[in-house]
Amino acid sequence: MKPHFFYCIILLLSACRTIEVDPPAPEFIGLEEISSAKPSFLFIQTEMALKPYLKEADQSLDKKFTGKSEQCEGVSYTYHFERDPLLFKFKEKEVETTINGAFDLRLSYCPTCHELFGEERCAIPRIYASCGVDEPKRKVHVSYQSKIGISEDFVLRTKTQLGEFQLIDPCKITVFQYDASSTIEKEVKASLIQLEKEIDQQLAQAPIKSSVAEVWKTLQEPILVEPYGVFYLRPQTIGIADLTLKNEGQKAFFTTQLTAQPVFSTNTLDLDKVKLPQNTPQNTKEQKSILHLRTIASYDSINRFLIKDFDTQKISISPKKQIHINKVQILGPQADRLVLAIEFSGSKKGIFYLVAEPYIDIDQHLRMRKVDFEIKTKSMLLHSAKWLLDAKVKEQIEANLDVDLGPILKESQAAIEKQINGEISKGVWLNGNISELRVEQLQFSSSCFIIDFELSGLLKLKIQ
């Protein structure tokens, strides 16, 4: 009786013992072996109010001009010109500046001079005349054309030239048959031509560079997406294209073009900031922004999701043999698959190892397929618990290993949209929306998943 009893005890202990398999060593796959994400392009429809700077230009420019020409023989004159406020009209890439003004002119005429005591004197008393003195001043209409562009260093560049000059009220002196209109035009034009450079200098004060620099700085700041990780836009180049002017509201409209290498990481990354580069516009008519977002998820972070979301799975192999899958953890890569550590209990307990190919399904879930036993595990189970190699184990793990990426994607989208909506600096507002998000590819290294997503939407920038 005793031998039979001890034999049963040995069988029972053998059936319940822990299965021990040496964990496989994951292969090393460095990040440098991971293919680069596609470049991202952002097209920000930008609106900038120029009216405040035009008003400043008007207030800073001279309003009164005086000139004279004195000689003994012939006509001498003194003039005073005073302008009204500047009127600006926008048309595509030009600003037309209109000036209405009025002048008065004092003249004297000497038909001939002779020298007396070493000094030239008029031979007869000088004849005096005037226009716009003790009477309404004579009116003048002047216009300038300014061609506008944006320089490599984001300064508003204008090329202003005097266009139309019209004496509405000519000045003709009948007493000595002299038409002063050409003289006035010459003198007033000389003064007004000096305004060309001053108008250019004033328009260059529009704070395009400071606004662009502030936007550039803001877009380089990390965006915390709690509790999942951090988003980095990582802008690389910037350009301003398609500049056009609209008279209504006197605004400039242009497309701010950015290239970027965005990254989302479950861990904080130490990334260098990029200085504001030169203005380098791209030759494209695209208006929709497309982000190719690289998401770096460490295995530790994915394993935390697995611990949180994975429910214990019961697998019945036969009426007397069953196991409970208690925990699944990712160890790292092996060829084109990942090694999974499976902690189980039941008729047997312990840890065995599977290999599986990760993929992301159409519902944005991280799943596993082509699940199989790792070679060391298979060898061990063939000798100690062959029944565990049943296909049900692989099938149920494949069916139930599921990490929903939807929440992290929605939180990321919401955090990004929050960051791109609002006043980013005084008088500068950015707003936009993300209309589409889809998975592009999945890769993995020794320490993390690399998931590339494509996001698309529209962005707008408003500068007061």
Question: In which residue ranges do the predicted regions lie?
Answer:
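Extracellular/lumenal and peripheral-membrane lipid-interaction modules
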Residues: R17-Q464
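Generic signature of intrinsically disordered, low-complexity, basic-rich segments
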Residues: I10-L11, V142
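C-terminal motif of bacterial Sec signal peptides marking the signal peptidase cleavage site
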Residues: L13-A15
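Sec-dependent signal peptide recognition
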Residues: K2-I9
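Residue-level signal for mature regions of secreted extracellular proteins and peptides
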Residues: I9-I10, F65
